[in-house]
Amino acid sequence: MRTIWFAALLAASLLALPAAARPLGKAEARALDRAIGAYLRAIETGDAQGVIAAMPPRVVSIFGAATGLEEKALRTMLVAQTDALMRTTTVRNLAADRSALDAGDETLADGTTVVWVIVPTVFVSEAGGKTARNEQPLLALREGKAWHFLRIDGRERREVAALAYPFLAGKTFPEARTTPLQ
């Protein structure tokens, strides 16, 4: 009886452990590098459509369910909101640290395999006459062959990410930092 109890406890504790982080494979790293480059260019050039296109479809579905909007209408609204924000904010010196990215591998309840990485980003923003240096973690997720990106720089954003990707619930992520500049 003790053996069965111990085996059950061991199995439960192993299931509770997060998947081991691993370095990205060469092909994965190249694909992620291209996707990050396209995403950063979209931000730098004020391409709201490109920014929204990079959002994970599962997150868009959650927003759609919460708002009652169909995906096309929701994406149109998100592009308009992002465009309005980008028109009042200048972003420069945008960079992502790709030097030491460790990936996690997870399988969702529907059988979808997801590779995820936290990408440190830094940029300078100017809005309303104020300039700030921003350091933000960016969640990169690969489902199938496509990489998608989601900011996770606050509790609400992390909660939305965990709704779409339950394996993220309870994970600790680097905090965003904003430093005013003169």
What are the functions of these language-model segments?
Residues 19-45:
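Short, low-complexity N-terminal intrinsically disordered segments enriched in polar/charged residues
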Residues 7-16:
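Bacterial N-terminal signal peptides
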Residues 127-137, 141-182:
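Low-complexity, intrinsically disordered terminal/linker segments enriched in charged
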Residues 47-62:
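Short, well-ordered alpha-helical segments enriched in acidic and aromatic residues
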Residues 22, 73-133:
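Surface-exposed, charged secondary-structure patches
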Residues 1-4:
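Positively charged n-region of N-terminal signal peptides that target proteins for export
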Residues 21-26, 76-80, 174-182:
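Compositionally biased, proline/threonine/alanine/serine-rich low-complexity intrinsically disordered stretches
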Residues 60-71:
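A short gly/proline-enriched turn/hairpin at secondary-structure junctions
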